[in-house]
Each structure stands twice: as structure tokens, then as C-alpha cells.
């Protein structure tokens, strides 16, 4: 065999193995979606606990302006089926446009313990971290649930999240008898924050809901509800590392307070900040907090059978591209190797090298093999999407199958050009502000957007 033939054979073997690995990850995400989400949610036992026995939860909603469907997203936490919680609505400007909406929601549900915190303090470039500082300090309970302003949840989500948080508790109690639940003893006056080896963060997979049918919004929805969800579930199923998107996160305030800052620039200070303030230099603070809980405190992560509904506003295709470019540029400074390999996990690229490898090693025409690969890929994506939508049917406008397929195809075709564009720079624009992402993953403010 010639040298070129040998190299071709080796290349075929390598690409076939890689193709199998990529498909294994995809099928793991699909399988997780089918097992965990493709059935009605089971009500949490915690919803029946007396107030004195239930672990208290402080729900924090950081707000900035009028986000999509804001009234309904805020109202969702006022209707939770859980006996003991408070809600904090946090803004940084007393003239914030979200405040009238907050007041309407609070007036409608006077029986819910809720308050507004307005504080303009700044501890870093991340406005969300700045907005959370005072609510963290003033929270009534140690158990915190941070829920983004664009997100809505079903009434049973909180109970199932708290139950997942305390899933380390050993018991021989019957799961069908709330009175025998070990969680009866996990009241605020006796429980302690999680320790190494226990669950220290609970999160949900986000599912996009799109009322404004612009093409950028539809492509974003297709991405979040298929590729992103599938990979998110697969990575979390392996439990090899933290993978948290941050739309909905529950953790202990005490645990957060014991985290050292991952920021090299802050660690170089004579008295570096700890706790939440130590994450101020990062735009992807949720991911960094998840990594710190995982690696520094050795705390596990858990997911429930709930999804968090992420309402997407009107996006142009350019808006969609800019959003994806921004987060790839942030991610490449945090996990460079994974970001460099990302194109190889996309449907079209993996289909091309997979079809070539099979043709080289086993014979066959490349085009039919590629088309078969793409047909299988879209089938897995649709099945994953349907499983995740099991408990949210009827929420959001009707969806056209043809429109979805067009948006899905556009997403797949744009994946490589977007990645290539993201590799050309380390500058991003977020909420009208330009930043440069440096090697540590920190963001440096460059000035106001022109």
C-alpha cells in the first residue's frame, strides 16, 4: 500500500471513530430527554409539607428593562406550589422600566412574600452579578434560586428542585407517603449547607418559546430546543464536569460565600473578594460559579424533570449571529480545546467526514451516506424536542413544522460560518456595552457601543 493509501486508511479510521463518538454523545442526550422528560411530571412531596418543616427558598429575579413577556415570567414564581418561599425582584435603577410590571404582579399576589431591592452598586463588569449582590445579603433563606428575567417555570418546579437539592438524604421512607419523608427533618433550623460529594447546584434545561416569528428568533428557538438541549443533557449525564447555562440555578448562599475568586486579576489584589463578588469580572458568571462549586467545593450538580421556559424576543438573523458569536468568543477563553473541536460535532461537518470514512473503509457512495446521516440527525433532534415539550404543551403559539425545518436547516448551515467569525476576535457586545475577553475568561470593558 502506498503512503497516500496508508494515510487515507488511518484518516478513515480516525474519522470513523470520531463520528461514532459524536453520535454516541447525541444519542446520550436524546436518551436522557426521552427517559427524564417524556412523561408527566410527578408532584413533589414537598408541596404537602407544613411551613415549619419545609426548607425555605429565596427566589431572586434580577431585572433590567422590559424583557419579552415580562409580566408572565414574573407571575410564574408567584404561583409556585411550595409552602415556604420569598421573592426578591432586583433592579439597579429606580427608574427601571421593569418596576411598574413588578408592582402589578405584587399587587395581584399580596399573599406571596415579595419585595423589591434597588441598588446601583457595582463590583465588576457583569451587570447581573452587580444586581445580585444586595439580594444575596438580604435573602431570608440560605437556599437561593436565581431565575433570569426572560424565564418562566411551572408551579411544581420549585418543589422538585428542592427535592433534588436534598437528594443525598438517605432514607427507607416510602416515596408515596409524604409524612414519612426524610425531608421533614430538613427544616431551616437543623439543616446544614451541602458538603463535598453532595448536590450543591440544581438547574434545568432551557426551552425557547417564540411569540415573535422573526427568522432570527426562529433559528434561535430551533437551536436551543434541539442541538443545545441535546448536548446540554448529554454533557450533564456524563457528570465529567460542570456544565451550567445559568437560566435557572439553585444553590446555597453559604456555599457561594466560601468560593474563592477564579479571577487572576482579583487574586492579585492584597485582599481579593470572595463569594459572589469574585465572579464580577466574568460575563459567563453562572458557568464560572458552577465550575467553582464543582472543583473547589466538590459539589455535584443535579437536574430535575422540569424545563425552564425562555421567552425569546424579536431577533433578526444578524442578532442571532451576534449572540452566538458572543458566547463562542467567551467560551473559547474558558474551554479552548472544546471550542476548537466544536465544528466536528455539528451535523453537516460530522456527516461529511463520517460519510467519507464509511465509504473509505466499508465502501459505498458518499452522498447517500451523508443524506442518511442528516435524516437520522434531524429525526433525533425532533424526538428530543418533542420529549422536552411533554409538560409544556399548549404554552406558546402554534408551531409550523415547515417553518421549524427551515429554521433548523438555517441553524445547521450557519454553524460553521458563525464559529469561524467567532475565532477572528475576542471582542463582544453585551447589552450595548463592548468588552474584550482575555485569556482567563474575564471581560474588560472597552467603552460604550457606537
Curated annotation (Swiss-Prot):
Catalyses which reaction(s): an N-acylsphing-4-enine + UDP-alpha-D-glucose = a beta-D-glucosyl-(1<->1')-N-acylsphing-4-enine + UDP + H(+)
Motif segment (D1): 96
Loss of function: phenotype: Results in complete loss of glucosylceramides (GluCers) in mutant cells.
Cytoplasmic-side positions: 30-337, 383-401
GO molecular function, one term: ceramide glucosyltransferase activity
Residue numbers covered by motif D3: 286
Keywords on record: Glycosyltransferase, Golgi apparatus, Lipid metabolism, Membrane, Sphingolipid metabolism, Transferase, Transmembrane, Transmembrane helix
EC nos: 2.4.1.80
Annotated signal sequence range: none
Pfam families: Glyco_tranf_2_3
Highest taxon, organism lineage: Eukaryota
Gene Ontology cellular component list: Golgi membrane
Lumenal side, ranges: 1-8, 359-361, 423-450
Described function: Catalyzes the final step in the biosynthesis of the membrane lipid glucosylceramide (GluCer), the transfer of glucose to ceramide. Glucosylceramides play important roles in growth, differentiation and pathogenicity. Essential factor in determining the success of fungal infection by regulating survival of yeast cells during the initial colonization of the host lung.
The family this protein is said to belong to: Belongs to the glycosyltransferase 2 family.
Domain notes: The D1, D2, D3, (Q/R)XXRW motif is a critical part of the GCS active site, involved in catalysis and UDP-sugar binding.
Name this polypeptide is given: Ceramide glucosyltransferase
Source species of the chain: Cryptococcus neoformans var. grubii serotype A (strain H99 / ATCC 208821 / CBS 10515 / FGSC 9487)
Amino acid at each position: 500500500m502506498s503512503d497516500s493509501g496508508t494515510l487515507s486508511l488511518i484518516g478513515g479510521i480516525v474519522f470513523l471513530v470520531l463520528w461514532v463518538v459524536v453520535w454516541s454523545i447525541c444519542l446520550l442526550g436524546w436518551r436522557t430527554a426521552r427517559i427524564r422528560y417524556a412523561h408527566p411530571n410527578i408532584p413533589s412531596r414537598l408541596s404537602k409539607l407544613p411551613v415549619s418543616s419545609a426548607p425555605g427558598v429565596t427566589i431572586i429575579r434580577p431585572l433590567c428593562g422590559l424583557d419579552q413577556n415580562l409580566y408572565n415570567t414574573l407571575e410564574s414564581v408567584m404561583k409556585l406550589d411550595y409552602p415556604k418561599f420569598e421573592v426578591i425582584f432586583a433592579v439597579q435603577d429606580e427608574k427601571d422600566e421593569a418596576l411598574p410590571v413588578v408592582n402589578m404582579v405584587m399587587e395581584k399576589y399580596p399573599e406571596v412574600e415579595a419585595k423589591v431591592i434597588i441598588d446601583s452598586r457595582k463590583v465588576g463588569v457583569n451587570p447581573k452579578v452587580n444586581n445580585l449582590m444586595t439580594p444575596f445579603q438580604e435573602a431570608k433563606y440560605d437556599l437561593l434560586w436565581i431565575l433570569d428575567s426572560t424565564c418562566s417555570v411551572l408551579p411544581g418546579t420549585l418543589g422538585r428542585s428542592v427535592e433534588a437539592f436534598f437528594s443525598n438524604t438517605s432514607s427507607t421512607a416510602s416515596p408515596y407517603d409524604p409524612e414519612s419523608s426524610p425531608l421533614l427533618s430538613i427544616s431551616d433550623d437543623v439543616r446544614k449547607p451541602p458538603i463535598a460529594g453532595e448536590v450543591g447546584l440544581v438547574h434545568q434545561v432551557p426551552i425557547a418559546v417564540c411569540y415573535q416569528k422573526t427568522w432570527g428568533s426562529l433559528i434561535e428557538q430551533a437551536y436551543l430546543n434541539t442541538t443545545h438541549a441535546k448536548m446540554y443533557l448529554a454533557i450533564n449525564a456524563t457528570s465529567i464536569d460542570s456544565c451550567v447555562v445559568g437560566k435557572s440555578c439553585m444553590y446555597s448562599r453559604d456555599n457561594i460565600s466560601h468560593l474563592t475568586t477564579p479571577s487572576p486579576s482579583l487574586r492579585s489584589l492584597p485582599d481579593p473578594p470572595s463569594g459572589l463578588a469574585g465572579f464580577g469580572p466574568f460575563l459567563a458568571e453562572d458557568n464560572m460559579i458552577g465550575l467553582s462549586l464543582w472543583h473547589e467545593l466538590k459539589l455535584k450538580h443535579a437536574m430535575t424533570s422540569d424545563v425552564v421556559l425562555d421567552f425569546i424576543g424579536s431577533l433578526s438573523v444578524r442578532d442571532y449571529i451576534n449572540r452566538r458569536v458572543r458566547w463562542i468568543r467567551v467560551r473559547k477563553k474558558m474551554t479552548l480545546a472544546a471550542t476548537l473541536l466544536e465544528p466536528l460535532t455539528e451535523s453537516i461537518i460530522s456527516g461529511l467526514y463520517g460519510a467519507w470514512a464509511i465509504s473509505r473503509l466499508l465502501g459505498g457512495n458518499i452522498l447517500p451516506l451523508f443524506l442518511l446521516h442528516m435524516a437520522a440527525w434531524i429525526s433525533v433532534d425532533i424526538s428530543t424536542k418533542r420529549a422536552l415539550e411533554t409538560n409544556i404543551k399548549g404554552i406558546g403559539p402554534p408551531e409550523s413544522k415547515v417553518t421549524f425545518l427551515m429554521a433548523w436547516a438555517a441553524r445547521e448551515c450557519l454553524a460553521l460560518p458563525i464559529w469561524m467569525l467567532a475565532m477572528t476576535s475576542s471582542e463582544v457586545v453585551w447589552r450595548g456595552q463592548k468588552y474584550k475577553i482575555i485569556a482567563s475568561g474575564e471581560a474588560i470593558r472597552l467603552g460604550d457601543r457606537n
